[in-house]
Protein backbone atom coordinates (compact mmCIF):
# COMPACT_ATOMS: atom_id res chain seq x y z
CA UNK A 1 0.00 0.00 0.00
CA UNK A 2 1.22 3.51 0.75
CA UNK A 3 3.00 5.38 3.50
CA UNK A 4 0.36 6.83 5.80
CA UNK A 5 2.60 9.80 6.65
CA UNK A 6 2.26 10.95 3.03
CA UNK A 7 -1.53 11.32 3.36
CA UNK A 8 -2.78 14.83 4.12
CA UNK A 9 -5.77 13.39 5.98
CA UNK A 10 -3.45 11.46 8.31
CA UNK A 11 -1.37 14.60 8.92
CA UNK A 12 -4.50 16.63 9.73
CA UNK A 13 -5.90 13.85 11.95
CA UNK A 14 -2.60 13.62 13.83
CA UNK A 15 -2.64 17.40 14.40
CA UNK A 16 -6.25 17.14 15.61
CA UNK A 17 -5.21 14.45 18.10
CA UNK A 18 -2.35 16.55 19.46
CA UNK A 19 -4.70 19.51 19.92
CA UNK A 20 -7.33 17.35 21.64
CA UNK A 21 -4.70 16.10 24.10
CA UNK A 22 -3.70 19.69 24.80
CA UNK A 23 -7.22 21.07 25.41
CA UNK A 24 -8.33 18.10 27.51
CA UNK A 25 -5.56 18.82 30.01
CA UNK A 26 -7.88 21.50 31.40
CA UNK A 27 -10.92 19.23 31.76
CA UNK A 28 -12.10 18.52 35.32
CA UNK A 29 -10.19 15.76 37.11
CA UNK A 30 -13.40 13.75 37.59
CA UNK A 31 -13.60 13.40 33.79
CA UNK A 32 -10.15 11.81 33.42
CA UNK A 33 -11.58 8.28 33.08
CA UNK A 34 -14.70 9.29 31.19
CA UNK A 35 -15.06 12.22 28.79
CA UNK A 36 -11.34 13.10 28.68
CA UNK A 37 -10.45 9.50 27.93
CA UNK A 38 -13.29 9.02 25.44
CA UNK A 39 -12.42 12.14 23.44
CA UNK A 40 -8.71 11.30 23.39
CA UNK A 41 -9.38 7.71 22.32
CA UNK A 42 -11.79 8.76 19.56
CA UNK A 43 -9.31 11.39 18.31
CA UNK A 44 -6.29 9.07 18.31
CA UNK A 45 -8.29 6.31 16.64
CA UNK A 46 -8.65 8.44 13.49
CA UNK A 47 -4.97 8.60 12.45
CA UNK A 48 -4.25 5.17 13.97
CA UNK A 49 -6.80 3.46 11.72
CA UNK A 50 -5.58 5.39 8.67
CA UNK A 51 -2.06 4.13 9.46
CA UNK A 52 -3.23 0.57 10.02
CA UNK A 53 -5.27 0.59 6.82
CA UNK A 54 -2.25 1.73 4.82
CA UNK A 55 -0.51 -1.46 5.89
CA UNK A 56 -3.21 -3.74 4.53
CA UNK A 57 -2.77 -5.61 1.28
CA UNK A 58 -6.03 -4.75 -0.51
CA UNK A 59 -7.94 -1.59 -1.32
CA UNK A 60 -11.07 -3.12 0.25
CA UNK A 61 -9.24 -3.57 3.56
CA UNK A 62 -7.86 -0.03 3.34
CA UNK A 63 -11.39 1.31 2.74
CA UNK A 64 -12.67 -0.62 5.76
CA UNK A 65 -10.10 1.02 8.03
CA UNK A 66 -10.89 4.42 6.56
CA UNK A 67 -14.53 3.78 7.47
CA UNK A 68 -13.50 3.00 11.04
CA UNK A 69 -11.59 6.31 11.05
CA UNK A 70 -14.71 8.10 9.83
CA UNK A 71 -16.75 6.53 12.62
CA UNK A 72 -14.18 7.69 15.15
CA UNK A 73 -14.28 11.19 13.64
CA UNK A 74 -18.05 11.29 14.15
CA UNK A 75 -17.59 10.10 17.71
CA UNK A 76 -14.94 12.75 18.39
CA UNK A 77 -17.21 15.41 16.90
CA UNK A 78 -19.97 14.45 19.34
CA UNK A 79 -17.59 14.50 22.31
CA UNK A 80 -16.48 18.00 21.27
CA UNK A 81 -20.11 19.15 21.27
CA UNK A 82 -20.67 17.53 24.67
CA UNK A 83 -17.50 19.15 26.04
CA UNK A 84 -18.68 22.56 24.87
CA UNK A 85 -22.19 22.06 26.27
CA UNK A 86 -20.70 21.02 29.62
CA UNK A 87 -18.59 24.21 29.48
CA UNK A 88 -15.31 22.29 29.46
CA UNK A 89 -14.38 23.90 26.13
CA UNK A 90 -14.60 27.60 25.39
CA UNK A 91 -15.84 28.92 22.07
CA UNK A 92 -12.42 29.48 20.45
CA UNK A 93 -10.89 26.02 20.96
CA UNK A 94 -14.24 24.39 20.20
CA UNK A 95 -14.60 26.25 16.89
CA UNK A 96 -11.05 25.41 15.86
CA UNK A 97 -11.43 21.71 16.67
CA UNK A 98 -14.95 21.51 15.22
CA UNK A 99 -13.75 23.00 11.93
CA UNK A 100 -10.77 20.66 11.88
CA UNK A 101 -12.79 17.50 12.55
CA UNK A 102 -15.24 18.41 9.79
CA UNK A 103 -12.37 18.95 7.35
CA UNK A 104 -11.03 15.53 8.33
CA UNK A 105 -14.44 13.93 7.82
CA UNK A 106 -14.76 15.46 4.35
CA UNK A 107 -11.26 14.28 3.43
CA UNK A 108 -12.01 10.76 4.67
CA UNK A 109 -15.27 10.59 2.71
CA UNK A 110 -13.44 11.71 -0.43
CA UNK A 111 -10.60 9.23 0.10
CA UNK A 112 -13.01 6.36 0.78
CA UNK A 113 -14.75 7.12 -2.52
CA UNK A 114 -11.44 7.15 -4.41
CA UNK A 115 -10.23 3.92 -2.80
CA UNK A 116 -13.51 2.13 -3.52
CA UNK A 117 -13.52 3.21 -7.17
CA UNK A 118 -9.95 2.05 -7.79
Predicted regions located by residue number:
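Short, C-terminally biased terminal segments at protein or domain edges
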Residues: 1-118
Amino acid sequence: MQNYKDLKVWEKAHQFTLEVYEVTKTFPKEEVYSLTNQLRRAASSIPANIAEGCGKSTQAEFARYLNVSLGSANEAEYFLILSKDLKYLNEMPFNKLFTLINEIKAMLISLIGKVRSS
